[in-house]
Amino acid sequence: MATVTVTNLSANTRANIKKNDPVILNAGYEGDVGCILIGKVVGLKHKQSNTDWTSTLTVQPCADEILGKLINKTYVQNSKASAIVKDLLNIFGVEVSKCELTTDVSYPRGRVCRGNLKQVLTEIVVNECKSRFITRTTGQIYITKADDGIDNGLTLTPANGLLRADEEKVQLPVETDLNSQTTGEDRDEDTISRSCLLNYRVATAEVIKIQSADLNGRFIVVEGKHSGGRTSDWETTMELRPY
């Protein structure tokens, strides 16, 4: 789930927001705007403090709704994991931006797929094929090899928004549920904290080239968030590890 907080919407706008309304949240700057969230309203709260109104929307990303559906299907002997995964996604009309497995497991006795679609896919992709299963709040789904990231050629430098580092390395687990990343890895590594001016292109498992006075190289986003407000700067914070 994602939480969107907006201040001082008009009374008419507040009254018109309903559960199940579609939500598309764009962010960026003049001439460079992109989407960071697509979903629907599943929770809504308006609160008044003096003359200010705060509206808090709980938004279910569109991919989560589809992946929450139930499946009950049995696949024949010697079925391949890749074929099963593609078929499961096709049943519900899910488009996958990338689908590559570390190990394409074969099931000599066939395989029963029963339960929540996301749970079934996680069992196959992560537990059995030792791969990554990534869903993004924009609705994109990626299935990648364990060591692969999603490389769209993003480079961050001080000239295009990279902010000075204020923290040293901190110990965090590589495997994280934040931002809907699930990996087949079970290990801890040092991650590097960095931030930049809000950048809609930064997302879980994105490969980023960093060029700065104290850090140079290619890194993968382990987790992160976009945040800001009327009294603070709009920033994207990231936990990175070398790629």
Residue ranges and their predicted role:
Residues M1-R14, K18, D147-D148, L154-Y243:
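An acidic/polar, Gly/Ser/Thr-rich interaction patch typically located in mid-to-C-terminal regions
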Residues M1-T58, R230:
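Assembly/oligomerization scaffold segments
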Residues K69-N78, Y107-R111:
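Second-shell loop/turn segments in exported
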Residues D52-A63, E95-L172:
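Short beta-strand-centered interaction patches in the first periplasmic/extracellular domains
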